[in-house]
Regions:
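ATP-dependent adenylation/nucleotidyltransferase module used to activate substrates
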Residues: 2-181, 185
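Gly/Ser/Thr-rich active-site loops/lids in small-molecule metabolic enzymes
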Residues: 184-202
């Protein structure tokens, strides 16, 4: 582990309460020293965004800087949506759900047209999203990257208008494996970026 928690340790001996408090303090130090007005967080309902929401909630109580949360579903399963709503309402000073499925479809349609995958000149409304996703040459990774970037456009616009920053939810395991999207799910400041996935669960 590097960065905020620059100490040697055995995972079985890790004091997660101490780790949590250090992450809260370091995040609070960053947002206050940069005179930021809000923290913006995309909440998926997964463990990473939930832990970051909990950290930022404590930062908000400590600094008075509000946490703005958004659940931005694109073809999400109902159970993921339910969890994201619970997390957002529990930890955020302001929380909304905004469905980005139409934005995703619009971008996907334009990209398919640009690359020549759509050649019959049928209009946007003629296609289902699944039709576009399954055109020859498209892959689940490419489609997933578009979804992540659609969400970041939304979050960064909020941060820009309200003079804040977007919180990153990536952990060290994802970073080392390359399991993240450039200009997608990586934000401005990552409270859990030095934690391995197992440690995120421990936290």
């Amino acid at each position: 582990m590097s960065g905020y928690l620059n100490v040697k340790y055995n995972m079985s001996e890790l004091n997660y309460e101490h780790v949590f408090n250090v992450l809260v303090d370091k995040t609070a130090e960053y947002v206050t020293s940069n005179n930021l007005k809000v923290m913006v967080l995309g909440i998926s309902g997964g463990i990473d965004s939930t832990v970051v929401a909990a950290i930022c909630h404590e930062v908000s109580k400590k600094t008075g800087i509000p946490l703005i949360g958004r659940s931005l579903p694109i073809k999400n399963k109902s159970d993921e949506f339910d969890v994201s709503k619970l997390v957002g309402e529990a930890f955020c000073d302001e929380f909304k759900v905004f469905n980005l499925s139409s934005s995703y479809k619009s971008v996907l349609f334009d990209l398919c047209a640009d690359t020549g995958l759509i050649k019959d000149c049928k209009g946007y409304d003629w296609y289902w999203v699944s039709d576009l996703e399954e055109l020859a040459g498209r892959t689940p990774i490419a489609n997933g990257n578009i979804q992540a970037r659609c969400r970041m456009i939304h979050l960064y616009d909020i941060a820009s208008i309200r003079k804040g920053l977007v919180m990153s939810t990536d952990n060290q395991t994802e970073y080392q494996l390359g399991f993240w999207t450039i200009h997608g799910d990586v934000g401005d400041f990552g409270p859990i970026q030095d934690l391995w996935k197992t440690e995120v669960y421990g936290l």
